[in-house]
C-alpha cells in the first residue's frame, strides 16, 4: 500500500463527522488489505505506531520534528503549535518538486523507518533519529507529510477511538460487535485482531496481556458492603499494578497499560520463579516498595520505572515486593469465568514466600470491615477493595463487582495545560490545569488548577514531559497533548462558570504522578458530577 493512498484515506476520514462513514472507510481498508499491512496502516492512522503491549517508543519530540521539517521546507521555527507545523509542512513541501525517478513511499517502508527510529539508542541516537526522519519527509507530498507528522506525535485527530475500530473490524469480517469487544479485552487491543485476519480469541494467551478488570469507587465501606452483601475485602495497596505471565523459568510483567516492563524487574522475576508453584500461569498483583515491612511512598517506587535502562543500584535502593490478588490462567486452564472465591482459594495453594497474597477478609459485617480497613490504613496502605464473592474476572471492565474505598476524596485527572511558576518555581511549569475525561466527545474538560503537592524533582520531570507534549505556547502558558495522569486530592467540588465543565475543585493538591495510568483511565466528568451531587445531598440532610 502506498503512503499516498493511506494519507488520502486519512483526509477523507478527517473530512466527515459521520461515525457511520468513518466505520465504512476503515472497514474497507481492512477488507482490501493484507492483514499485516492493514495492521500497520491502522497503527499509523491512529497515531500509535506500536500497539499497547509493545514497549518500543519513538522518542521524537515536536522540537525534533520541527527541526527536521524546517531544514527541508525552510520554515522558520516561530512556534510549536501542532496545526502550524502541519500547515508549514503541507504548504512549503507542496512548493517543492520530488525527483521524477524517486520511488513513492509505501506504508511498509515508512513503518520500517519508524521501527529503526525507535531502536536508536546511546551516544549519537538523537542525530540518528533526525537522519532517519529526513528520509520520508524529504520524499513526502503535502498529504503524506501531514499524516506522518501527526502520527509520529500521536495526534492524528481522526476520531478513530477503540469503539470505532471495533465496529470497523466487525463490519470488515462480518463478525458480531459483541464478540469483537470480548476478544479485544482478552487480546488487549483491536490491532491484533486485524493482524490475525479477523480470527478472534476469547481465552487468555500466555505472554499476551489482557486488559485489567477495574474497580468503581464507593463512598464508604458500609455502602460497599450493603451493595455487595457478604464479600471479600482486600487491602488496597499503594503500588504499581502488574500482570505476571510465567512459563517455567520465563517470567514477563505487563503494566496496567499493557506495556512490557520486565526489564525493570529482574529481582521480582526471581521472586516469581521461587514463589509461584505453577508451570504456566497468568496472575494479577501489585508491586510495592517496602522497608521494614512498611510500604515506601509511591514516588519512590515509581523511580524504578522512569529510566529506559535500569540502574542496578536502584534494585538495592528500592527493594520491591510482589503481592498477588487474582488468577487468570493456570497450566492451560482459563479462570476468567470462575468465581472470585474459587480463584482466591486456588491462589492459596500456589503462592509462597518470597511472593505474598494480598491480605483478605470475608465478611458481611460493616463494623468488622471497618476494623480491617483501619488496620490497612495503619499499615500505610490506601484503603480496601470490596469484591463480590461469585464475580467472574471481566477484562477491561470497570463494573460494580469490585468497589474501592479510600480515606480521602481523590480523582485521577489529566494535565492539559500549565503555566510557569513564580519566585523559586519560575524555572518550571508548576501550575497545572487538570481535566476529567468526557467519554462521549473524547474531550478532556478542565475542572481545576493547582501548583501544590509536588517535589522539585517532580516539577523538573513534568516540565520536561510538557515540553515534549507541547501543542502551543502563549506567554507563560503551555498547552499540551493530554498524556500525563495525576492523582489529585481535594476538599470539595463547586459549580463554576470559569470552566467549560461547569465544575471546579477546591483546595486541589497533586498527591502523585500516575505513570502507570493512561489518559483513558482518568476519571470521567460524570464521576465529578456524581461526587458533586452527593455533596449537595449531604449538605441538604
UniProtKB/Swiss-Prot annotation:
GO terms for biological process: cell division; DNA biosynthetic process; DNA recombination; DNA repair; lagging strand elongation. It is an enzyme of class 6 (ligase). Its EC number is 6.5.1.1. SUPFAM superfamilies: ATP-dependent DNA ligase DNA-binding domain, DNA ligase/mRNA capping enzyme, catalytic domain, Nucleic acid-binding proteins. It catalyses: ATP + (deoxyribonucleotide)n-3'-hydroxyl + 5'-phospho-(deoxyribonucleotide)m = (deoxyribonucleotide)n+m + AMP + diphosphate. GO terms for molecular function: ATP binding; DNA binding; DNA ligase (ATP) activity; metal ion binding. Its cofactor is Mg(2+). ATP binds at residues 234, 241, 256, 286, 325, 398, 404. DNA ligase that seals nicks in double-stranded DNA during DNA replication, DNA recombination and DNA repair. This is DNA ligase 1. It comes from Korarchaeum cryptofilum (strain OPF8). The gene is lig1.
Amino acid at each position: 500500500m502506498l503512503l499516498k493512498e493511506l494519507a488520502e484515506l486519512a483526509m477523507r476520514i478527517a473530512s466527515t463527522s459521520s461515525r457511520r462513514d468513518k466505520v465504512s472507510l476503515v472497514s474497507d481498508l481492512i477488507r482490501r488489505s493484507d492483514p499485516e499491512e492493514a495492521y500497520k496502516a491502522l497503527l499509523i492512522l491512529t497515531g500509535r505506531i506500536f500497539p499497547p503491549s509493545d514497549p518500543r517508543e519513538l522518542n521524537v519530540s515536536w522540537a525534533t520534528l520541527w527541526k527536521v521539517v524546517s531544514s527541508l521546507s525552510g520554515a522558520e521555527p516561530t512556534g510549536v503549535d501542532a496545526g502550524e507545523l502541519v500547515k508549514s509542512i503541507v504548504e512549503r513541501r507542496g512548493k517543492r518538486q520530488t525527483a521524477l525517478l524517486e520511488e513513492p513511499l509505501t506504508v511498509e517502508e515508512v513503518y520500517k523507518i519508524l521501527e529503526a527510529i525507535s531502536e536508536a539508542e546511546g551516544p549519537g541516537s538523537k542525530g540518528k533519529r533526525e537522519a532517519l526522519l529526513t528520509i520520508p519527509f524529504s520524499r513526502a507530498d503535502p498529504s503524506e507529510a501531514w499524516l506522518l507528522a501527526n502520527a509520529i506525535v500521536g495526534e492524528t485527530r481522526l476520531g478513530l477511538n477503540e469503539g470505532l475500530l471495533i465496529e470497523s473490524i466487525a463490519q470488515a469480517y462480518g463478525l458480531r460487535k459483541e464478540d469483537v469487544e470480548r476478544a479485544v479485552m482478552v487480546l488487549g487491543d483491536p490491532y491484533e485482531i486485524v493482524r490475525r485476519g479477523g480470527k478472534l480469541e476469547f481465552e487468555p494467551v500466555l505472554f499476551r496481556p489482557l486488559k485489567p478488570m477495574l474497580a468503581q469507587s464507593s463512598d464508604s465501606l458500609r455502602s460497599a458492603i450493603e451493595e455487595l452483601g457478604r464479600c471479600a475485602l482486600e487491602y488496597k495497596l499503594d503500588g504499581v499494578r502488574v500482570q505476571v505471565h510465567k512459563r517455567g523459568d520465563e517470567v514477563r510483567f505487563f503494566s496496567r497499560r499493557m506495556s512490557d516492563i520486565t526489564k525493570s524487574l529482574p529481582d521480582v522475576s526471581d521472586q516469581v520463579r521461587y514463589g509461584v508453584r505453577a508451570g504456566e500461569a497468568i496472575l494479577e498483583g501489585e508491586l510495592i516498595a517496602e522497608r521494614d515491612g512498611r510500604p515506601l511512598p509511591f514516588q519512590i517506587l515509581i523511580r524504578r520505572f522512569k529510566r529506559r535502562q535500569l540502574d542496578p543500584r536502584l534494585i538495592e535502593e528500592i527493594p520491591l515486593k510482589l503481592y498477588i490478588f487474582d488468577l487468570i490462567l493456570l497450566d492451560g486452564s482459563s479462570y476468567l469465568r470462575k468465581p472470585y472465591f474459587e480463584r482466591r482459594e486456588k491462589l492459596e495453594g500456589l503462592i509462597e514466600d518470597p511472593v505474598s497474597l494480598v491480605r483478605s477478609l470475608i465478611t458481611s459485617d460493616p463494623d468488622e470491615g471497618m476494623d480491617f480497613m483501619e488496620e490497612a490504613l495503619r499499615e500505610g496502605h490506601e484503603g480496601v477493595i470490596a469484591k463480590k464473592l461469585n464475580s467472574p474476572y471481566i477484562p477491561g471492565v470497570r463494573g460494580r463487582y469490585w468497589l474501592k474505598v479510600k480515606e480521602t476524596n481523590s480523582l485521577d485527572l489529566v494535565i492539559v495545560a500549565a503555566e510557569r511558576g513564580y519566585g523559586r518555581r519560575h524555572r518550571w511549569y508548576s501550575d497545572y490545569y487538570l481535566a476529567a475525561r468526557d467519554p462521549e466527545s473524547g474531550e478532556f474538560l478542565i475542572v481545576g488548577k493547582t501548583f501544590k503537592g509536588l517535589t522539585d524533582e517532580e516539577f523538573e520531570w513534568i516540565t520536561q514531559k510538557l515540553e515534549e507534549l507541547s501543542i502551543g505556547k502563549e506567554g507563560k502558558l503551555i498547552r499540551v497533548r493530554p498524556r500525563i495522569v495525576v492523582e489529585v486530592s481535594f476538599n470539595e467540588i463547586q459549580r463554576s462558570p470559569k470552566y467549560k465543565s461547569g465544575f471546579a475543585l477546591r483546595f486541589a493538591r497533586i498527591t502523585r504522578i500516575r505513570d502507570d495510568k493512561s489518559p483513558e483511565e482518568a476519571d470521567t466528568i460524570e464521576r465529578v458530577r456524581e461526587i458533586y451531587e452527593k455533596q449537595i445531598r449531604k449538605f441538604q440532610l
